[in-house]
Amino acid sequence: MNYEVVIPAAGQGKRMNAGKNKLFIEAKGIPVIIHTLKVFENHDACKRIILVINEQEFGEFNTLLKTYHFKTPIEMVPGGRERQQSVFAGIKAAGKEETVLVHDGARPFIKREYIEQLVEKAKETGAAIVAVPVKDTIKRVQDGEIAGTIERSSLWAAQTPQAFRLSILMNAHLEAEAKGFLGTDDASLVEEAGGTVAIIQGDYQNIKLTTPDDLLVAEAILEAEKRNEHV
C-alpha cells in the first residue's frame, strides 16, 4: 500500500492574478501548498514526497518546509517549463516505492479514503485516477455558436491524485518525449502509449484552486472542517 507522491508546484497560476506562485497564497492563514502537503504527511502509507519547484523559489519553499516541520521526507526537484516536464523530473527522482502518485499542489482537499482506493486500484491495474461524473450540460462550440450537445453520461472530469506503477508512468513519459506529445494530464500519456487507466469516483470537493473565486470556496471548506472537528 506504500507509495511516493510527486507534487508539481512550479507553475505561476496566472488566472489567480496573485503576482506570485498561487501555492504561497494563504487559506485560513496557511499557504495552500502546506494544506496539500499535510494531507500526505498525515497518511502513513506515503513514504516520500517529491516537490517539483521553480528553482528561483527554492528559498521560499525551503523556509515553509522548515516552518511547518514535516516528518515525511520531502525532496525538492527543479521543474521544467511545462507541467509534463516537471512531473517527468519528479518521477525520475522517485523509485523507492513501486507505486507513484501525481497530485496537483493546488488540490488541498483530497480525502484519505480516495487515496487508499486509488493506490489499491493502481496496484491491481497499473494505472488509476480519481474523477467525478460531469454534472453540467456540455456544448460543442464553433465560431461562437453551438455546434452540438455532447452526451454527458459517459463524461467524467479528471482530478488528481493519479496513481501508477512507476514503470508504466516512466515509459509513458519517455514515449511522449520521443513523440513530442504534450498531454493534459499523466493519464493521457499512458493512454497515448496504449495503456488503460482505471477510474475511482471521488468527490466534487476535491477542487483545484485556479481562480480567486476558488479561494473563497477553499476558505468555506476549511471553516466547515474546523466546525466539524468540534462537533
Swiss-Prot record:
CDD domains: CDP-ME_synthetase (cd02516). The keyword RNA-binding does not apply. The record marks 152, 208 as: Positions MEP for the nucleophilic attack. The record marks 15, 22 as: Transition state stabilizer. One of its GO terms (biological process) is isopentenyl diphosphate biosynthetic process, methylerythritol 4-phosphate pathway. Keywords: Isoprene biosynthesis, Nucleotidyltransferase, Transferase. InterPro entries: IspD (IPR001228), IspD/TarI (IPR034683), IspD/TarI_cytidylyltransf_bact (IPR050088), ISPD_synthase_CS (IPR018294), Nucleotide-diphossugar_trans (IPR029044). It holds the Pfam family IspD. Pathway: Isoprenoid biosynthesis; isopentenyl diphosphate biosynthesis via DXP pathway; isopentenyl diphosphate from 1-deoxy-D-xylulose 5-phosphate: step 2/6. GO terms for molecular function: 2-C-methyl-D-erythritol 4-phosphate cytidylyltransferase activity. Belongs to the IspD/TarI cytidylyltransferase family. IspD subfamily. Catalyzes the formation of 4-diphosphocytidyl-2-C-methyl-D-erythritol from CTP and 2-C-methyl-D-erythritol 4-phosphate (MEP). This is 2-C-methyl-D-erythritol 4-phosphate cytidylyltransferase. It comes from Bacillus licheniformis (strain ATCC 14580 / DSM 13 / JCM 2505 / CCUG 7422 / NBRC 12200 / NCIMB 9375 / NCTC 10341 / NRRL NRS-1264 / Gibson 46). The lineage of its organism: Bacteria, Bacillati, Bacillota, Bacilli, Bacillales.
